[in-house]
Amino acid sequence: MELLSALSLGELALSFSRVPLFPVFDLSYFIVSILYLKYEPGAVELSRHHPMASWLCAMLHCFGSYILADLLLGEPVIDYFSNNSSILLASAVWYLIFFCPLDLFYKCVCFLPVKLIFVAMKEVVRVRKIAVGIHHAHHHYHHGWFVMIATGWVKGSGVTLMSNLEQLLRGVWKPETNEILHMSFPTKASLYGAILFTLQQTRWLPVSKASLIFIFTMFMVSCKVFLTATHSHSSPFDVLEAYICPVLFGSASGGDHHHNNHGGSQGGSGPGSPHSPLPSKSKEELSEGSRKKKTKKAD
């Protein structure tokens, strides 16, 4: 009890927020990011036939969040590539995952208990990047709430918001896989986290930044580790969104029903024509019947 009272939550959170990310946590971030790249269809063949394109895709997976954040803030998009240590470390991870003999490195990091450790450490990096991105945006735009939220969001989402560009580098074009249309759990969590950190940065959330980093990191680590261990693609926010979204934005089925009724009312020729137009199937049957009559007359 004395130990628990001596080690308060504030001191623990402050110590946790001061833990350096390089090289251990950044290494885990690179491993998981490039591991997901190898899961993509055709990624292994691309690394054999076009290694430079594969390397560029790996760098996007590792540093795409920095590129997007610099683009939003009007800074050089290749600024982070001046960090030689991170580039060399990410390149070494890319080479080991794709070209290690007998896929030994890939098999080791894919082993589920080891992978869960890397996934947890990646979420530590994600939350820290959200907080740093919002602090950086606040330095340029003191009252730009939406700028801070957008910067923190892209910092946390990583390459997912650039998925279409990354697919083009692999020679794939799937516009239906746009992350904004179909948000995954990390993208949604990064958005909600960016809102929380923006409220804290602007003094609207009465909590210290270190405590918020610690609490949100524990939430992200718990959720992501559970989803990875159970091989689930669902989101913990689905239950909450199922209740809130119909209230705020209406249900999609109700809108479709109204649209169909509106189209059906315009389909008639007016109040004096209660019958709707014939469906396409009945028209085809009528045309087949007329053809049969013509053939009988010809016989």
From Swiss-Prot:
State any single GO MF term: potassium channel activity
Where does this protein come from, organism-wise?
Answer: Bos taurus (Bovine)
Q: What does the subunit comment say? A: Homotrimer; conformation seems to be controled by binding to diacylglycerol (DAG).
- Tell me the protein's name: Trimeric intracellular cation channel type A
Do you know which InterPro entries this protein is assigned to?
Answer: TRIC_channel
Q: Which family does it belong to?
A: Belongs to the TMEM38 family.
Task: Name where it mostly resides.
Answer: membrane
The SS bond pairs are none
Protein purpose: Intracellular monovalent cation channel required for maintenance of rapid intracellular calcium release. Acts as a potassium counter-ion channel that functions in synchronization with calcium release from intracellular stores. Opened by a change of voltage within the sarcoplasmic reticulum lumen.
Q: Where in the cell is it found?
A: Sarcoplasmic reticulum membrane; Nucleus membrane
Extract the Pfam families matched here.
TRIC (PF05197)
* Compositional bias of kind Basic and acidic residues: 281-290
Q: Activity regulation here?
A: Channel activity is activated by a change of voltage within the sarcoplasmic reticulum lumen and blocked by luminal high Ca(2+) levels.
Keyword Transmembrane helix included in the entry's annotation: yes
Entry binding sites for Ca(2+): G74
Q: Where does a 1,2-diacyl-sn-glycero-3-phospho-(1D-myo-inositol-4,5-bisphosphate) bind?
A: K122, R126
Q: List where the protein spans the membrane.
A: 19-39, 53-73, 86-106, 145-165, 179-199, 210-230, 235-255
On the Cytoplasmic side, which residues? 40-52, 107-144, 200-209, 256-299
Q: Which GO terms describe its cellular component?
A: nuclear membrane; sarcoplasmic reticulum membrane
Give the Lumenal membrane side ranges: 1-18, 74-85, 166-178, 231-234
The organism's place on the tree of life at top rank: Eukaryota
- Which reaction is this enzyme known to catalyze? K(+)(in) = K(+)(out)
The ranges of region (Disordered) come to 256-299
Q: Which GO terms fall under biological process for this protein? A: cellular response to caffeine; endoplasmic reticulum organization; regulation of cardiac muscle contraction by regulation of the release of sequestered calcium ion; regulation of release of sequestered calcium ion into cytosol; release of sequestered calcium ion into cytosol by sarcoplasmic reticulum
Q: How does it sit in the membrane?
A: Multi-pass membrane protein
UniProt keyword annotations, A-Z: Calcium, Ion channel, Ion transport, Membrane, Metal-binding, Nucleus, Potassium, Potassium channel, Potassium transport, Sarcoplasmic reticulum, Transmembrane, Transmembrane helix, Transport
